[in-house]
């Protein structure tokens, strides 16, 4: 029976990829003082009787490093899009020009940069915890197989493989965090 044990490392990696994907989404929502279309992804507009993402009511562009524009398709929604942005907590003051909403991105002060850097660190720690939980699930499968007759050598081999995958993903999180924090702190 122990010869038949195969740990599904593809499943472990797929689940860890999900944690990394969530981290990237959280990082994208952090405003770094540089314009990006992704910073508006969490903003929802009350349009046509339902909450709708901004990119479904207009075209989002980044014409300059510190400017985002939204070309709203339905003139009747311009006010609702403006209101959604003001209430989003992004700290951006929309300026109207017909059906185009311009969003000048203000510089971040030093205190706000430090705050955002800490938030990025918290997001990274949540991702690390997710990775470690997935690692623990893999290790539990190996321990169960050991109880069912898996040899100690095979157990060590599988545990080493799970640890190597975990280390690789944790390093990826640390690298992404360092990049994001450098981006946030850049003036």
From Swiss-Prot:
The Swiss-Prot or TrEMBL record describes its family as follows:
Belongs to the RRF family.
Give GO BP annotations, semicolon-separated. cytoplasmic translational termination
Q: What SUPFAM superfamilies is this protein classified in?
A: Ribosome recycling factor, RRF (SSF55194)
Q: What is the lineage of its organism?
A: Bacteria, Pseudomonadati, Pseudomonadota, Alphaproteobacteria, Rhodobacterales
The Gene Ontology CC terms held by the record are: cytosol
Q: Which CDD domains match?
A: RRF
Pfam hit, one: RRF
| Protein name per its UniProtKB record | Ribosome-recycling factor
- Organism, by scientific name, is Roseobacter denitrificans (strain ATCC 33942 / OCh 114) (Erythrobacter sp. (strain OCh 114))
Chief subcellular location equals: cytoplasm
């Amino acid at each position: 029976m122990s010869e038949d044990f195969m740990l599904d490392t593809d499943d472990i990696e797929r689940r860890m990829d999900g944690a990394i994907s969530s981290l990237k989404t959280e990082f994208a929502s952090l405003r770094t003082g540089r314009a990006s279309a992704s910073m508006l992804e969490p903003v929802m507009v009350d349009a046509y009787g339902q909450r709708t993402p901004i990119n479904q009511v207009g075209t989002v562009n980044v014409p300059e490093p510190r400017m985002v524009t939204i070309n709203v398709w339905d003139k009747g929604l311009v006010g609702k899009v403006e209101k959604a942005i003001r209430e989003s907590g992004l700290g951006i003051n929309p300026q109207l020009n017909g059906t185009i909403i311009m969003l000048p991105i203000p510089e971040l002060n030093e205190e706000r940069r430090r705050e955002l850097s800490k938030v990025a660190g918290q997001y990274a720690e949540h991702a690390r915890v997710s990775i470690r939980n997935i690692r623990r699930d893999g290790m539990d499968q190996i321990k169960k197989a050991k109880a069912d007759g898996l040899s100690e050598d095979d157990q060590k081999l599988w545990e080493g493989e799970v640890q190597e995958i975990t280390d690789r993903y944790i390093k990826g999180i640390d690298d992404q965090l360092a990049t994001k924090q450098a981006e946030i702190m850049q003036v």
